[in-house]
Amino acid sequence: MTIMDIDDHSRLRDLAVSLIRQAAEGYSPKYGYGSMSCAAYDTAWVSLVAKPFNGIKKWLFPQSFKFLLENQENDGSWGRQTSPVDRILNTAAPLLSLQRHAREPLQLHDVCEDGDLDDRIHRATLSLQRQLSDWDIASTAHVGFEIIVPALLNLLAAEGLCFSFKAQDELMKVNAAKLKRFDPEVLLYGKHKTTLLHSLEAFVGIIDFDKVVHHKVGGSFMASPSATAAYLMNASCWDDEAEDYIKNVLVNGSGRGHGAVPSAYPSSNFEYSWLLSTLLHAGFTAKDIECPELCDVAGMLENSFIEGQGTIGFARSISSDADDTAKAAFALNKLGYDVSVNEMVKEFEVKNHFQTYPSERDASLSANCNTLLALLHQKQVGAYQPQILKCVKFLTRCWWNTDGPIRDKWNQSHLYSTMLMVQALTEFQAILDQKGLPYGLNTVEMARVSICLFQGCLRTMLQQCEDGSWSHSREQTAYAVLTLGQARRLSTFKHLQSQIDSAIDQAATFIRLHSVDLAQQSLPEFIWTEKVSYTSPLVTEAYCLAALKVATSLVDNPGIVGESLDLGIPSRQRIDKYIWLFHQTPLFRSLPEWQLRASFIEGHLFLPIVNEHRLDVFPRKNMDPDDDYIRLIPFTWTATNNRNFTFASPAWLYDMIMVSVVDYQADEFMEAVAGLTFSEDLSMLVGLIQEVLTPYKTEPASPVTSLIDMSSVQCPRAKLSNIASGDIEEVRTCLRRFASFFLDHPAVRNAQRDDRATAWREVHNYLVAHVRHTQDNMRLNLQEQRRWYVSRNMPYFHWVRSNDDIACPITFGFVTCLVPYLVANPTVERAVIGNESESIVTSSDVSFDSVESKYYADDVCRHITNVTRIYNDCGSVVRDATEKNLNSVNFPEFAVTASGSEKQALRAMGEYERACCQAAFQRLEEASLQTATTEAERAKRRRRLDVWKVFLDTADPYGQIYVVRDFTARSVHVRETGIASTAKDVPLVSSSVPLVGGGPMLVT
C-alpha cells in the first residue's frame, strides 16, 4: 500500500491501520519484532563466531562474512552513514573479521586464500586510518563509543594492525573516565541488568563471560547480536539458545537471510511505542486507528509495563530506559489506558534532568522531551510540577547553549530534536494557558521558553528546500511538518500563519510524491543512532503519515497557545513600520518581508531578559528617557543571524545584544556623567580608568594603541579640581561595573592569554578614547572659528584610525573571547547544559593561531571601525554642528575634495574602507583554515568564521538605518553645556555599508 495522492482523512486512517497491522503481523511470541536496518559492525561480530563440527572448527555464519565481502566500498570502508564514528565502527569490526579470516580461513579457504583478501585488508586499513585521523571526539555523541572503539583498536593491535591518530589521547582519557567506574562484579555479574550488556563485545579479555549468562533473555544479551556473538566466542560452554537467537535474527531481521544483522533485535517496544505515539500526537484518535491489531500492539506494551514493574526498555525483559517508558506511557494513556509514570520518575529523575538510563555520560534532549510529554498527559498533571519544570529548564538550557543545529544522541537529524522540543514546550505553554499548572518560572525563564520555541519553528521554516522538503528526505521532512504544525498553534506566529500553511502544503506534496511501500523502501536514511546509525522503515512511515495528517487537518483557533504569557508582540502594522526601513537596505533588500517580520518577533522575545539586566552596569541617571534603541538592538542581531542561516546560539545572541546595550549606555555615560563630572580635569578621569582596569591587566603588558599623554587631556581652562567625592565614587562604581561586565565574563576569564589581553586593551582604549574625544570637542568649541579643527595637528587619516570610542573595537575584543567559548566548543556546551560547576570548564582555544590570521583579524577590526566612523559622520553632519560635536568634515583636508562634496568624499572613503574590510576578512578566512590539520578542525574554524560574519554583518544595518532615523539618545546636559562627546554609534558596531553587496542608503 502506498501513500500517493492522499487527500481525504479516511484514506489516511486506512493507511494508519494498515501500518499497525503490518507491525503486529511481524511479531514473534518468542523473539518479538524488529525492522531496524542492518549494520556492518554487528554483522562482522557475527561473522567471527566459530564452532566445532565433528571435531573440526568452522565459521558458523559464513553468509555474514560473504555479506562483508559484497558490501565493502571502493575506498575500503563499510557503510554510507555520514557520522564519522559510524564509519569507524563499521570499518574497524569488518577489518578485524577480514584479518582473522585471512589468518585462519577454516572452511572458507577458497575465499580467504585469494590474494583479493590482502588487498581488501590493505584498503580497509588505510580507510580506517584516514577516518581516525579526521575524527572529532568532542562532538561525538554515539552511545558507548568511548568503550567500543578502544576495545576494537586493541583487538586489531593484537592482530598486528596498529593505529595512531591525533585524538587518541583524548579518546583514551574518556575511556579511562568511563572504565574508572567499571566493576564487573557489580555491573555485569550481579542480578541487576545494565546497558553494558548491550556491548559485551567491548569487554573481550576483560570479563568472565561465564558469569553473565544469567542475563540472557530469549537467547540474547540485551537484544544485541554483537554482544551475543562475543558471548558465544568467549563462553567456556557452547550455548545453543544464543546460537538459535542469531540464526533467527539472520532470517527474520531486516537482513532476511542475506547474512546481515541489525545492531538490535528485537526492538518491539521501541518501534511499537514510536508508531502509536507518533500517530496519536499528530491527531489520529483511538477510534481512527481502531482494529484488532491495535489491541495486540497496545497489549504487548502494557504487558511490558507489567513485567518491568512500571518501566520498560526497547524490548521485553531488558534494561528499562526513560525514553521508551515515556513514549509508551504517552501512547497508552492517549488510547485510554491508565499508565502511571511514578516508577519512571523514581528510577530516572536526577538533579537537573531525567537520565535515559543509569550512569549515562551525556543527558539526552529527546528523552527529556518525551518524558515531559508523558508528564503533561497525566490525569493529575499538577502532581508532577517539579518534574515538569525540571524538564522545561533542561530543554531550554540545551537549546539556549547549543551552537548551530541542536542534535541528540538517539537521532542525528537536528529536525528530530527540534520537533520534540517544540512539541513538548508547546504542550507546556498550552497547559499554562489552561491554568493546569502554576507558572513556576520567573520572567527570564519564561522568556527563554518562548525564544526556544520560536527559534525552533522559525529556523525549521527557513531551511526548507525549493522542492518543499528538508534535506530531500521524507522522514526529515515529516519531522519539519510536525514542528510547523505546532507553530500554527503558537501566538508568536499569528503574523506568519500564511507562510506556515504554505510551507506545510509544499512539504506534504513532497512526501506524497516520494512515498513507497515498506517492502519497496529504497535509499534508507541512517539517522537513528544505536551503536551505529540505522533506519526503521516502520517508524519512518509512521512519521510520514503523521505529517500528512497534520497537513490535512484544520487547527482550531490557530495562534492562541501562549497568549496567557502576555508577550506583548506588537501588531503587524507596527512591526511592518520597523521592517520597512530595514527592507530598504542592501543587506536585507532581497529577503522576503515575512522573514524580517519573523526576526523582529524573535528579537522582541529577548526584551524581557534584556530589561531584567539593562541597568546592571549603568543606572541611567541624567540619560535620555527615550530608549527606542532597546527595541531595535535584538532585531539587528536576530535578522543577521537568520539571514544566512548561521543560527548562532541564543546564548551568543543574548551576549551580543547586551554588549550592544551596554556599549550604547557607556557612550551616553561617558558623555553625560563622566565627561561632565571631570570636564575641568580630564586627566583625573583617565587616572580613574587606569585604576579600575589595572587589576584585570594581563601580563606581559598588553600593547595599547591609544594611550593618552596626561598633558594632552588637560582642559584648556584647567584649574584646581573641585569634584565632589560622591560624584567621583559614582563614576568609579560605574566604570568598575563596566570593566567587570566585559572582563569578568566567563568567556574572557576562560580565554587564552592573548585573547584576554586583546579584550583588556580594547576596553582600556575605548574608555580613554572617549576622554580624548571629549577633549577634541572642547578644543573645537574654544577655537575662534569652528569650521575647521586645527587645535590638534593631526591628519584626518590618523584621527579616523585612532578613534577607539567607536564600539567596534571593544566589541571585537569581546567577540575574540566569546566565539571560541560558545561556538564549536562541545566541552563548554556540555558543562553549561549539564548545569555543572564552572570550575570543570577548560580554557577555550585561541581565536586565531597564526601571525597572519591575527594580523588580518586586527585589520578587519580597524577597517570596520573606520567604516563606522566615516558613515556615521556622513549621516550626522548637521546634528554634530548643532550639538557642537567634532565631525570628520571639520578636518581641514575636506576643503578640497575629488568627489564634489564633503559627503561624497566620505562615501568614497567609506566604500574604500568597506572594500578593505572585505579583502581582509577573505584573507582571514584563508589563513585560519590553512593551519587546520584535520577536517574536524577545519569544520570548527569554518563554523566560527560564520559566526564572526554575523558580527561583521550586524555592522551594516545600524549605519544604514541610522541615516534614515537617528536613534541616538542625547542628554539634556549636552544641550545645556555644549560639552559633547560623539555618542555616534547607535547600538554597537555601526556601519552604513553592507559587507556583502550594495551601497549605503544615505540622507543627503
Curated annotation (Swiss-Prot):
GO terms for molecular function: copalyl diphosphate synthase activity; magnesium ion binding; terpene synthase activity. It catalyses: (2E,6E,10E)-geranylgeranyl diphosphate = (+)-copalyl diphosphate; (+)-copalyl diphosphate + H2O = phyllocladan-16alpha-ol + diphosphate. Mg(2+) 1 binds at residues 667, 671. It comes from the Eukaryota. A motif (DXDD motif) lies at residues 321-324. Mg(2+) 3 binds at residues 872-873, 876, 880. Gene3D superfamilies: 1.50.10.160, 1.50.10.20. The keyword Lyase applies. A motif (DEXXE motif) lies at residues 667-671. Its cofactor is Mg(2+). Its EC number is 4.2.3.45, 5.5.1.12. Keywords: Isomerase, Lyase, Magnesium, Metal-binding. Mg(2+) 2 binds at residues 667, 671. One of its GO terms (biological process) is diterpenoid biosynthetic process. The DXDD and DEXXE motifs are important for the catalytic activity. Belongs to the terpene synthase family. Involved in the synthesis of labdane-related hydrocarbons by catalyzing the conversion of geranylgeranyl diphosphate (GGDP) to phyllocladan-16-alpha-ol in a two step via type B cyclization into a (+)-copalyl diphosphate ((+)-CDP) intermediate. PANTHER family: (E,E)-GERANYLLINALOOL SYNTHASE, ENT-COPALYL DIPHOSPHATE SYNTHASE, CHLOROPLASTIC. This is Phyllocladan-16-alpha-ol synthase. It comes from Phomopsis amygdali.
